[in-house]
């Protein structure tokens, strides 16, 4: 249903977007202007599902103006489960976040705006830092002062004119390198992850190999024949968000 009446001003619409995002289930929400994200140089994404360079917002929406970045807290190990389906992994926690974001997309469309759910070649981590959600940590995750690394990101690109938030500029890592030292396979160096070395980036054959099999079973314990917990070692090592996660 398209909104009828005078269009909202940017501040009013921004406030409504943030209110709805929290009401739908997000714990964190921030706004980035499309031009600010596009000003970030294209960089390599070593994702578990694809590896390529980031794109500009106009790759998805010619008249893109704003990005909404949502942070959904993961407060229990159940949110870190992975299901092996035939020859690939599925992450049930992603479905929850996508549901919250999809509801916000429907609201924007009802306001007469265009909205793209999860433009996958735009860096959600860069969005999160630009939107003030946290800093890019040495474990390559976004670290929030309250939640630490224990939240997941969902994003929406829209032609709506929204009021951007201030970037996060504090350094929450400082001289700490606990996450780097904790990695069982040495996949981390400061602010960089080797996706081929990371347990979650390995092929199924590598995970069951003589070299990595025992490490895999220790850090990605099986729950059923086809379900396991993803490795959280570098997250557990982080000093931020520990109390809320029940680690202290």
Task: Label each region the model flagged.
Residues 1-86:
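Non-catalytic, usually N-terminal nucleic-acid engagement modules in DNA/RNA processing proteins
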Residues 79, 85-248:
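Catalytic cores of enzyme domains
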